[in-house]
A protein has these predicted regions:
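Phosphate-ester processing/binding pockets and catalytic centers
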Residues: 1-309
Length: 309
């Protein structure tokens, strides 16, 4: 994909320099027509290449301080909120909010498969739905968080999955995202940045740090962070798990979600265009803001959990 010629300033410096981002993707929920989970979530984290080392060092610092060196996986969190795993997970979320969100942008697309407007017949295979919604999440994130950038270069990463023969996820996502953004730019050129691919396929990354290849250690940590954030959003939406550690993390991200639902001038967490969750479709086929399970009185609060542990 080619860019137009760069415009230079009077000092010979590009007026709109290209910014390179790594996109990390993971999902929560399983799609099975007529069964499976109600909510399918696809989360994506945009990490600037220039900041990737800083992000990795900060995540490693939390590991060192908590003494936890195993995989940080939302599904494996249990009751204890003061154990090493939960403390590391909480530390990662706090670091994202307090530091990473200044330059790392996260977006989650939450798809309600029980909505009357959800069109099951559009997807002949389960992976068709998976790939389609992953693509939608990435395009939504580009439109919302990368709009201020004129030119970006992208490299895609996702957690390793067992994929059915014929599933072209690794090739489909980069090419279709770029084609779609190009078409949208023809209609609204100021709404999207120009895009160049740094790698033609999604790089599949093992999320277990004990087995990941040494040259993908930084990517491994970021994939785990996306899993943690996306799983916590799923818990905030559904309240499905009674595990105290998951409830505690859901309260954290639930607060971010509620704040970003306010008009920008009323938000207090400074996450506008940095952290976002989009839910769809409602009965009219539109995006909407469903009530969060974390606002239910039946949910165990973070402070109660800490006192009981």
């Amino acid at each position: 994909m080619l860019f137009s010629a760069q415009q230079l300033t009077m000092f010979g410096v590009p007026a709109n320099p290209e910014i390179a981002f790594h996109i990390f993707h993971d999902e929560s929920g399983t799609y099975v027509p007529g069964a499976g989970d109600r909510w399918l979530l696809h989360g994506v984290l945009f990490v600037p290449e220039a900041k990737r080392g800083e992000v990795f060092a900060a995540l490693q610092d939390v590991r060192q301080k908590t003494g936890y060196n195993e995989e940080v996986h939302h599904q494996k969190l249990r009751q204890s909120v003061t154990g090493l795993k939960a403390r590391c997970a909480t530390g990662w979320l706090r670091f994202y909010f307090g530091q990473f969100s200044d330059f790392c942008f996260y977006h989650c697309l939450a798809v309600d498969t029980h909505s009357p407007d959800f069109q099951h017949d559009r997807f002949g295979e389960r992976h068709h739905a998976y790939n389609r919604f992953a693509r939608m999440a990435i395009e939504g994130a580009i439109a919302w968080s990368l709009k201020p950038y004129a030119r970006v270069a992208l490299k895609f990463h996702s957690d390793v999955k067992s994929r059915k023969e014929g599933d072209n996820f690794a090739e489909y996502i980069p090419s279709e995202v770029c084609l779609s953004i190009d078409e949208k730019r023809k209609k609204k050129p100021a709404a999207y940045p120009e895009i160049r691919l740094l790698h033609p396929e999604v790089i599949l990354v093992e999320s277990d740090p004990s087995v990941v290849m040494s040259d993908l250690r930084e990517e491994c940590e970021c994939v785990q962070l996306v899993d943690l954030m996306t799983g916590s959003i799923g818990q905030a939406l559904t309240g499905r798990s009674g595990q105290r550690a998951k409830i505690a993390l859901a309260e954290i991200v639930g607060g971010w979600i509620e704040d970003t639902r306010q008009p920008p001038w009323l938000q207090s967490e400074d996450l506008h265009r940095r952290f976002s969750v989009s839910c769809f479709p409602n009965e009219q086929g539109h995006f909407y803001n469903p009530a969060l399970a974390t606002t239910s009185k039946d949910q165990l609060s973070l402070f109660d959990a800490l006192e009981e542990d």
